[in-house]
A protein has these predicted regions:
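Conserved acetyl-CoA-binding loop-helix of GNAT-fold acetyltransferases
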Residues: 99-116, 220, 226-239, 243, ...
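A conserved beta-turn-beta hairpin within the catalytic core of GNAT-like acetyltransferases
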Residues: 73-91, 207-216, 225, 273
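Conserved beta-strand in the GNAT
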Residues: 56, 62-72, 198-207, 214-219
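Conserved active-site alpha-helix within GNAT-family acetyltransferase domains
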Residues: 128-157, 231, 255-273
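Conserved GNAT acetyl-CoA-binding A-motif
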Residues: 115-138, 241-252
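Active-site rim helix/loop that mediates acceptor-substrate recognition in acyltransferases
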Residues: 17-54, 172-190, 194-195, 204
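A short, internal acetyl-CoA/4′-phosphopantetheine-binding micro-motif in the GNAT/acyltransferase core
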Residues: 83-103, 218-226, 253-254
Length: 284
């Protein structure tokens, strides 16, 4: 018999979520996953949620789905600045077996009722994903049954991104020098690229574990774009990370940013698929 409950075995949810084939569901320990699931922070150490709830769907004591939802601890003003005066109702995680659509419906209905429908509700909000999964909050493309259910409930796609992964190997580039700043509370690092002592660009790297890192963003100065400097910076960055023991290096970019897609693919990143975030039509 199917039942929805807030009494659940957290290890069941850990195993269940990792059973979904997603390129950014890295092989993480239960303790690492639990920290991200229950009490997560962003790269600067800010708590992501001020309240967070979980409902699980069991059929004869077997987990067939779960939903995690709540209200964020901050949001983004029109100018992009972070503000603690803004909070979003977010469905952070929603996973259920493909052949158990009724479980997904019950879970989503439970979340929507508790979040309220007067304000816009977000699902798979990119920024508020789990740190152990590179805080890539979007839903991977192979979950068509989840996508379909969200759309049945009035959600529409907000943004789509292309997810990339690369395997690092030893490479040398002596022309570009790196200046790395200290790690943030969220284990991220700002790095400057320099040639002949002059800064030509920069990036932000998130270290997920001893062997895996994630590129948040990268840029080169506008006046040197198209001169091959970006490729040299990436070569230097990969060499720097490889020497630190990193062998997997992932990133993502907007689906309509074809320039960035070309850059990543030119520099050895493999396209893994498309991810999406969602929202309802109600305005905040």
């Amino acid at each position: 018999m199917l039942k929805i409950t807030d009494t659940y075995n957290l290890k069941d949810i850990y195993d269940f979520q990792l059973s979904f084939k997603t390129p950014y569901f890295f092989d993480v320990s239960f303790d690492t996953w639990k920290k991200s699931f229950e009490d997560d922070i962003d790269g600067e150490g800010r708590e992501l949620f001020k309240e967070l709830f979980v409902k699980a769907a069991y059929d004869n004591d077997k987990l067939v789905g779960f939903v995690q939802y709540g209200k964020t601890a901050f949001g983004f003003a029109d100018n992009g600045e972070i503000s603690s005066d803004i909070s979003y109702p977010v469905i952070r995680n929603l996973y259920f077996k493909e052949d158990r659509a009724e479980a997904g419906e019950l879970l989503l209905n439970e979340a929507m009722q508790n979040l309220g429908t007067k304000k816009r509700v977000y699902a798979f909000f990119h920024y508020f994903g789990m740190t152990c999964f590179a805080r890539h909050g979007k839903l991977f493309e192979n979950n068509a049954h989840i996508d379909a259910l969200l759309k049945e409930y009035g959600f529409e796609v907000e943004h789509k991104n292309v997810y990339y992964s690369s395997v690092l190997s030893e490479s040398k580039n002596s022309e570009v020098m790196l200046t790395a700043n200290g790690l943030t509370k969220g284990n991220q690092q700002y790095i400057d690229f320099k040639i002949d002592g002059n800064q030509v660009g920069g990036c932000e790297v998130h270290y997920l574990n001893d062997t895996t890192a994630y590129l948040r963003w990268i840029y080169v100065n506008g006046d040197i774009v198209g001169k091959g400097i970006g490729t040299k910076c990436m070569e230097a960055l990969k060499s720097f990370l490889y020497e630190k023991g990193i062998n997997r290096f992932d990133t993502d970019t907007a689906i309509d940013n074809t320039v960035a897609q070309h850059y990543y693919e030119k520099n050895g990143f493999i396209r893994e698929g498309v991810t999406g975030s969602y929202y309802t039509k109600q305005e905040n």
